[in-house]
Amino acid sequence: MEKRVFLIVLDSFGIGAEPDAAAFGDEGTNTLGAIAGHPNFNCPNLKKLGLFNIDGVTAGEKTDAPAGAFARLQEQSMGKDTTIGHWEIAGVVSPNPLPTFPNGFPEELIQEFEAKTGHKVLCNLPYSGTEVLKDYGEQAMKENALIVYTSADSVFQVAAHEELVPVPELYRYCEIAREMLKGAYGVGRVIARPFLGSSAETFYRTTNRHDLSLKPPRATMLDLLKEAGRDVIAVGKIFDIFDGQGVTEKIKTTGNTNGIAFTKALQTRDFEGLAFVNL
């Protein structure tokens, strides 16, 4: 068996707010603390590795002899979204945050997007991805419109009903948006959010999500490994987050269970290098 590393990121799984959380409107956030009280919460393997032994973690029970090394890390980059975080893991610290749009995107930008896609745009506000379908999904179906929304992160998200806007067409619209969103409007990710269903109560997001990211501003750990002749296997969103830069093989997943299955399958493969997994 060759030398290899499995680097698995539990995306958005935090253990408490950082000192600068107020700058991002995230005071008091703690994903682990929020879910640990649920009756179905159970993570024996993470417990064995030392999750509950990490400094500052008050949820769960510590283990006397952790099987893994553990630490509490603080991000150095000025930003908190998926793109910035993964880039830092790979060695790129970002001195400036990617732009966010708490009041929606400028009207002239939306009008240009409408003209280039031939579809009316609805919403154009920060929104929950599930709530936006409840509030705008039926109108989008009636008008064959696109739902554009953002969040606290640097994202431009485009939702469309798969039966009205085929998935490849939605991907093309997102490529149009990616070309438009540069400079001051250069969001970290443009995200295609296809959905299905027939009413506000039945709409659901499908597994055909697709992210279009900015390229990292310089070489990352992935590039160095690739240049050294090592394998860099991207599982889940990793390929999209790095816009393919430094990746030698990509594995698309349809969710966390699927992602874990692919990761377990990789454990039986001979390769030398990195398996970078996003769950």
Residue ranges and their predicted role:
Residues Y127-V132, P168-I176, S213-P216:
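Active-site glycine-rich loop that binds ribose-phosphate moieties when present
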Residues E112, Y173-I176, T220-E227:
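Amphipathic alpha-helical segments that form well-ordered structural scaffolds
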Residues S77-G79, D135-E138, A177-L181, M221-D223:
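A generic local secondary-structure boundary/capping motif
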